[in-house]
C-alpha cells in the first residue's frame, strides 16, 4: 500500500513488475490519496497545483495509470475510492490540519477500507512503509499505521463483518533502503557523467536518504530484467520527477539512483529460507502457493 501516485515505482517498482510478470501471482496496488499537494515540474501544468486550480490529483490519476501499465500491474485501487482521503502535504504544513487529509483519517475507518480489499483479494503478502513512513511524510506514516492495523483486523471475525469473510495475511513487509545500497548508488552517481551535467540545485546526498543497517534487511528482491519497466513507470510520473538513465530527481531537487534491487524488512510473519546472500530473495519465501 502506497501513499501517493509515484511512491509505488520509487520503492517497489521493480518488485511489482517482477511479480506482475508471473501469471501465478496477483499484484494489487492500493494508493491512499491522489497526491493533490504535490509540486509540479512542468511549467505549462503549474496551475494544476493545490494553490491554483487544485486539479493536480485528477491529472496524477492518469500518470498512475500509465505507470501501472509500464509495470504490468492491472489491479489498482484507491483506498476508500478515488478522493476519499486527501494528500496531507509535508509534515507541519497547514494542509495537515485539513479534515479531509489522510493524516487526519479515522484509523478504524481507513482500516475497514483496506480490510475490504484484503478480504476480497485474500493476499498472502502485504507491503507498506516503516513506522516513520520512510522519510517522515505524514501520509506515509498513516499508510503504515493503517496497513498494520488492517493486517490484524482482516483476520478478526468481530471486525467489520460486513466487509467480508476474515482472512489472515501470512506476511507483512516494510520497504527499506539498505545503507550499503545507498552508499554504492551515491558513489556510482558521483562517478558518472550525470554528476557533471546535473541541473543546478540537484543534490545527491547519501546522508539525506534515510536508510537501515544491512543487518536489519531481511529480504532483497533482485529484478534487473524489470529495471527498464521501472524507469518507464518513473517517466510516467512526469509532473513529479525527471529521469535520466539510472538517475532520477524529485521535485525537491534530491537526486537518487533508480534501483533494480529493492530491499524489505519482514515486520510480521515467519521468514522463509534465506538465499546464498543470507536474505530472502522472494517475498513469498516459505509460503505454500
Curated annotation (Swiss-Prot):
Q: How is the cofactor bound?
A: Binds 1 zinc ion per subunit.
The chemistry this enzyme catalyses reads: 1D-myo-inositol 2-acetamido-2-deoxy-alpha-D-glucopyranoside + H2O = 1D-myo-inositol 2-amino-2-deoxy-alpha-D-glucopyranoside + acetate
SUPFAM superfamilies attached to this UniProt entry: LmbE-like
Q: Which Pfam families match?
A: PIG-L (PF02585)
Q: What is its EC number?
A: 3.5.1.103
Q: Where is the signal peptide?
A: none
Record's keyword terms, sorted: Hydrolase, Metal-binding, Zinc
Which InterPro entries does this one have? GlcNAc_PI_deacetylase-related, LmbE-like_dom_sf, Mycothiol_biosynthesis_MshB
Task: Provide the GO MF annotations for this entry.
Answer: N-acetylglucosaminylinositol deacetylase activity; zinc ion binding
State whether keyword DNA repair applies: no
Per UniProt, where does Zn(2+) bind? 4, 7, 140
**Biological-process GO terms, alphabetical:** mycothiol biosynthetic process
List required co-factors.
Zn(2+)
What domain of life?
Answer: Bacteria
Family label: Belongs to the MshB deacetylase family.
What is the documented function of this protein?
Catalyzes the deacetylation of 1D-myo-inositol 2-acetamido-2-deoxy-alpha-D-glucopyranoside (GlcNAc-Ins) in the mycothiol biosynthesis pathway.
Q: What is this protein called?
A: 1D-myo-inositol 2-acetamido-2-deoxy-alpha-D-glucopyranoside deacetylase 1
| Native species | Frankia alni (strain DSM 45986 / CECT 9034 / ACN14a)
